């Protein structure tokens, strides 16, 4: 059986990563025993994927409208507005 090495997105550790149940959609969740962060590799909703926030900010800075951004990315208008509203705060 082949094993796949999964690294923690927070601390980049590979040796302390263990499976940690499943999400409500049935996707495998993982837990890093070093930093105690949990994550999953697959997402059901597009807005939950890593990098979505930065894509929304980049599109806004390039002059793409909110409704067009929502349509292109496949997320709701309120999601776009929430990301833009929270972009001024430090993440």
Curated annotation (Swiss-Prot):
Keywords for this protein: DNA recombination, Transposable element, Transposition
A Pfam cross-reference name: HTH_Tnp_IS1
One annotated GO biological process: DNA transposition
InterPro entries reported for this sequence: InsA_HTH_dom (IPR024431), InsA_N_dom_Znf (IPR003220), IS1_transposase_InsA (IPR051252)
Keyword Methyltransferase belongs to the record: no
Lineage: superkingdom: Bacteria
Keyword S-adenosyl-L-methionine: no
PANTHER family: INSERTION ELEMENT IS1 1 PROTEIN INSA-RELATED
Role summary: Absolutely required for transposition of IS1.
Family (UniProt): Belongs to the IS1 elements InsA family.
UniProt-recorded name of the protein: Insertion element IS1 5 protein InsA
Species name: Escherichia coli (strain K12)
Lineage, opening ranks: Bacteria, Pseudomonadati, Pseudomonadota, Gammaproteobacteria, Enterobacterales
